[in-house]
Amino acid sequence: IADTAGVPLYIVHVSCEQTHEAIRRARQKGMRVYGEPLVQILTLDESENINTDRNHAARRVMSPPFRSKDHQDSLWAGLQSGSLQVVATDHAAFSTEQKRAGIDDFRIIPNGSNGLEERLAVLWTEGVETGRLTPNEFVATTSTNIAKILNIYPKKGAIVEGADADIVVWDPKISKTIS
């Protein structure tokens, strides 16, 4: 429909291989289709939702749900090849107490997970440090690509003369525990 209307299509929460493959095929045909997996989906798998600790499992309720490692491998490959462009978080944090409200009925557990604070560090650790992404692919998936998609590049998404000085400085060697 988007192609017929001549507009781009931006697909959020890409979590499975089939969706990634549909985006890849559409892009191969020249369609302006973009895919955005979440950092949580790239790094946590379906075992999070079946954990015997009900509080742990409740804290992981989000949509779409976590998938198997096979799906994660496809998404990482998509980021490497450029068939997926941006990594986001869909940050929707809730306290353990809020998540516990639906402990006896998962349908009323608040849907969402944190991720904004951790996105860069987790993507660097699980992407660059494992060899799944190069440092340039990391920058592209966190900054450059979205600026291009939103037609604000090179004013945003690049470190060049005349661009806004939006820079994040952080030490990827610092370690902390995410709970």
Ranges and model annotations:
Residues D3-G6, R59, S81, Q85-V87, ...:
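His/Asp/Glu-enriched, well-ordered alpha-helical/loop segment
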Residues S15, L38, A92-A93, V168:
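Catalytic metal-binding/acid-base residues of hydrolase active sites
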Residues K29, D171-K173:
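Short acidic-glycine loop/turn motifs at beta-strand connectors
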Residues I174-S179:
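Short, Lys/Arg- and Gly-enriched loop/turn segments at beta-strand edges
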